[in-house]
């Protein structure tokens, strides 16, 4: 008989619902714990997205920035652990991870649905498909660019960009007063960062050029996507 991992007869297949937790190895327990924690953070991330849609000022909260960075770290850690430890999984471990993966996929579908609703809302308000599809594409490119510059200022610019994206939309660009308010806000945060005692001169010089670049890109996004009604509190 050929060796196989399949059970052709249902009465001979192991029942995962009656499996004992003690059968899991320490490696499996660690992986399942981290994956479950990652799924919980994904759910909290979706809830924060929904709250920030209703209250854009939440994007300035340090809790939000810390949660997003921690969520990104666990994403990479989960992938690394999966590639390293997955071959040693038993049947019970695979069954548990299948349920967790299903939950994660469901959460990602919710996030995609929220983005689709925002797109439909923007299309309904502007009446232009080009404007509606332009905003998400430009902000995704901005997000990828900022991920390559892991500085506090870059994170700040990303949060301000999200405020533009989640704010009210209309068919006119940002006013000069709104651009001035944005510049004051960004420069104020940047001044506090560059005066930090733990910041080296080399990092300040390198990040200074990055700051000017991101400020230019952010203003271009605001004008290019024709966003308005941004509230600065």
Swiss-Prot record:
A Pfam short name: DUF2632
Intravirion side: 53-69, 115-233
UniProtKB keywords: Host Golgi apparatus, Host membrane, Membrane, Transmembrane, Transmembrane helix, Viral envelope protein, Viral matrix protein, Virion
Coiled-coil positions: none
InterPro entries given in the database record: M_Torovirus
Residues on Virion surface side: 1-31, 91-93
Function: Component of the viral envelope that plays a central role in virus morphogenesis and assembly via its interactions with other viral proteins.
Subunit structure: Homomultimer. Interacts with envelope E protein in the budding compartment of the host cell, which is located between endoplasmic reticulum and the Golgi complex. Forms a complex with HE and S proteins. Interacts with nucleocapsid N protein. This interaction probably participates in RNA packaging into the virus.
Membrane spanning residue stretches: 32-52, 70-90, 94-114
Name of protein: Membrane protein
An MF annotation (GO) of this entry: structural constituent of virion
Main location: virion
Organism expressing this protein natively: Berne virus (BEV)
Membrane topology: Multi-pass membrane protein
Subcellular location: Virion membrane; Host Golgi apparatus membrane
An example Gene Ontology CC term for this record: membrane
């Amino acid at each position: 008989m050929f060796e196989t991992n399949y059970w052709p007869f249902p009465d001979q297949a192991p029942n995962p619902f009656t499996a004992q937790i003690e059968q899991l190895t320490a490696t499996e327990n660690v992986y399942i714990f981290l994956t479950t924690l990652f799924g919980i953070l994904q759910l909290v991330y979706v809830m924060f997205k929904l709250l920030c849609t209703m209250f854009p000022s939440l994007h300035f909260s340090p809790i939000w920035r810390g949660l997003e960075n921690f969520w990104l770290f666990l994403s990479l850690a989960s992938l690394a652990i999966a590639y390293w430890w997955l071959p040693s999984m038993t049947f019970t471990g695979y069954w548990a991870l299948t349920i967790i993966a299903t939950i994660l996929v469901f959460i990602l579908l919710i996030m995609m649905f929220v983005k689709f609703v925002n797109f439909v809302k923007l299309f309904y308000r502007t009446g232009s498909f080009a404007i509606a599809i332009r905003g998400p594409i430009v902000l995704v490119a901005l997000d990828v660019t900022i991920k390559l510059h892991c500085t506090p200022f870059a994170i700040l610019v990303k949060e301000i960009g999200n405020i533009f994206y989640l704010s009210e939309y209309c068919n006119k660009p940002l006013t000069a007063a709104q651009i001035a308010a944005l510049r004051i806000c960004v420069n104020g945060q940047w001044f506090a960062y560059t005066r930090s005692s733990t910041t080296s001169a080399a990092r300040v010089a390198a990040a200074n050029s990055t700051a000017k670049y991101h400020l230019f890109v952010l203003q271009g996004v605001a004008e290019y996507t024709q966003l308005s009604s941004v509230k600065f509190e």
